[in-house]
């Protein structure tokens, strides 16, 4: 899968090699379900640093780990970005040793907790460039009472 920005920053071009097709996802559709999963198109798309603001709330032990995390609140920079993503904010637990998000709470446009993310089995996938990725992800949609599990993440 390859995701790129379209001519409008709010549009995304999605290429799925299995189907050999490019699909354009317009800005307002990016908060909709990604192929029936609990992920939205905006969840799997590349984000830009200027699309949101972040502030460190505190430092604490990462959920389910012994390592230290920063707890960071991320909010969309504009109402347009807020509507596009479908989130009013997220709170993310980011490991201090490798900057990988290992947990996250995502809030809907009314401020209600909507999704919970847990990422485990974090491994260094590219030692030369010091890139780390989780190899097991659980995303839970609390409003639909549905979870997505992935343990086949490849780099």
What is the predicted function of each stretch?
Residues 16, 26, 58:
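Residues at the C-termini of beta-strands that transition into short coil/loop
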Residues 20:
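Phosphate/NTP-binding elements of NTP-utilizing enzymes
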Residues 44-59:
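A short, amphipathic edge element
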Residues 6, 64-66:
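Solvent-exposed loop and beta-edge segments used for protein-protein assembly and interaction
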Residues 55-63, 120-125:
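Short amphipathic beta-strand and strand-loop transition segments with alternating hydrophobic
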Residues 1-17:
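N-terminal mature ectodomain segment of secretory-pathway/periplasmic proteins
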Residues 2, 11, 23-25, 32-47, ...:
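Gly/Pro-enriched, hydrophobic low-complexity segments
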């Amino acid at each position: 899968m390859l995701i790129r920005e379209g001519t409008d920053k709010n549009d995304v071009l999605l290429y799925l090699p299995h189907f050999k097709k490019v699909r354009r996802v317009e800005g307002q559709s990016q908060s909709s379900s990604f192929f029936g999963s609990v992920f939205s198109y905006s969840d799997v798309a590349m984000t830009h640093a200027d699309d949101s603001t972040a502030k460190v709330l505190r430092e604490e032990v990462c959920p389910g780990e012994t390592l230290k995390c920063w707890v960071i609140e991320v909010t969309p920079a504009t109402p347009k970005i807020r509507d596009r993503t479908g989130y009013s904010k997220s709170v993310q637990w980011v490991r201090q040793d490798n900057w990988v998000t290992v947990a996250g709470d995502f809030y809907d446009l009314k401020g209600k907790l909507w999704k919970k993310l847990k990422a485990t089995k974090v491994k260094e996938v590219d030692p030369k460039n010091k890139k780390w990725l989780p190899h097991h992800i659980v995303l839970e949609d609390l409003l639909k009472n549905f979870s997505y599990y992935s343990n086949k993440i490849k780099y």
